[in-house]
From Swiss-Prot:
It comes from Lactococcus lactis subsp. lactis (strain IL1403) (Streptococcus lactis). This is Metal ABC transporter substrate-binding lipoprotein. One of its GO terms (molecular function) is metal ion binding. It is a lipid-anchor. The keyword Lipoprotein applies. The gene is mtsA. Belongs to the bacterial solute-binding protein 9 family. Lipoprotein receptor antigen (Lrai) subfamily. One of its GO terms (cellular component) is plasma membrane.
Amino acid sequence: MIEKYKNILITFIALAAIVFLVGCSNKKTDQVTDKKINVVVTNSILADITKNIADDKINLHSIVPVGKDPHEYEPLPVDVQKTSKADLIFYNGLNLETGGNAWFTKLVNNANKKENIDYFPVSTGVEVIYLEGKNTEGKEDPHAWLNLENGIIYAKNIEQQLSKKDPVNKDFYKHNLDKYVKKLSDLDQQAKSKFSLIPENEKMIVTSEGCFKYFSKAYNIPSAYIWEINTEEEGTPDQIKNLVRKLRATELKSLFVESSVDNRPMKTVSKDTGIPIYSTIFTDSVAKKGENGDSYYSMMKWNLDQIYKGLAK
């Protein structure tokens, strides 16, 4: 009988030990998972650049949904929650998220986050282009990522802050950055070579919003537009009339319309000038997953290819 109770006791102790060890193992696993830093970015373009560098080493949340306008946005409760718990926050800067309704400023202030401690502009180091005739702070053209050289600056700034916040993975981040920079740089050089072949009198990119100034400077292609920035009036009769008048004096073969804006004003321009809309292109957002342009690299490649084909046809 005593021997029987002994065996039961030994079995009980063994089971208790197994439960304890499994519990410790799960706790360690949870601790490893919890070591991932929480990163919040303001839009899908920054999310993709960050993902290329950090991969699965971080918990990543992007605020403005794919296809939506980051100029003026109303954060959802989940955005507020993720921002308050974020270890690191990346935003474009250049008045993109802080102009208009200043949604980002309100978001980080309410979360008690501090600039250059908790949140960082990825555009630091970019040569700023301003809205026409407005060379003052708060009047920056924010669309710097449409020049691949600036996309590389964004990536380097993101890697720098990731490595500071998470030094355990800094070699991983740097390795991924180097690969990504080469990929973007190769595409940039290919584009410059192709656009140099187009006759000067056929070079002009016409879009709805005047968001291609950085692109124009990078690839030596003049730009024209209906309205200058999405936070102002969009597609008024006078704006359309002024662009139509300008285009009638050109030999332009193609117009373009952005994926994130109403295409009706550009359709009116096309009808009044006889110049066809060649393609939709990407500006403020990548495409939906699985579609052409669903990453920063692929949206830029799409833009470069479509604009080249439209101008060279």
